[in-house]
Amino acid sequence: MHNYENEGAGQLPGEPFTCAIQAEKYGPAMDLALHQAALSAHLGEVPVGAVVINDDGEVISQGRNRREELNDPTAHAEILALRSAGVKLGTSHLEGCTLVVTLEPCAMCAGAMLLARLKRVVFAAWEPKTGACGSQRDLVRDVRATHRLEVLAGLRQRQAQALLEDFFAQRR
């Protein structure tokens, strides 16, 4: 398995890393996402949390993994946060919004982000097995898509990875 820790300072090759700016602008939302992830773990769900914010950093919605609780394979933190944001804003188009999430989104979540027309996604930990924002595939920046997102990766990576590692260690 590939270790993405500190590779390219958290970014894919060729992209500038703006850690100080990310930490200041997106850190508070990532802290909320990490709290949601910890709550998921406490409730027996894979620890993933997500927060949708607007350009001013105002929190629009939050979500956590609820697949087991709802018996719904689509109840990922990202999907639930996007649904809630759409309801709150009264639109399915979330232009100008950013999704902040503790784990690189999968293909399903990446597709939902494209359909929501988000401005960017900020995630903590890479998901080398199923990630669709740069590791396994890169659906959100595919030039063939009608919309593309900015991707910022690696913010609070160690904290997110620790939550995941602790969760799975308890189940082995």
Describe the residue ranges of each PLM region.
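Short beta->alpha transition motifs characteristic of CBS
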Residues: I60-R67
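Short beta-strand scaffold segments in enzyme catalytic cores
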Residues: V48-G57
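Zinc-dependent deaminase
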Residues: M1-L43, V59, M108-R172
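Small-residue (primarily alanine) positions within well-ordered alpha-helices
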Residues: A33, A37-S40, A50, S61, ...
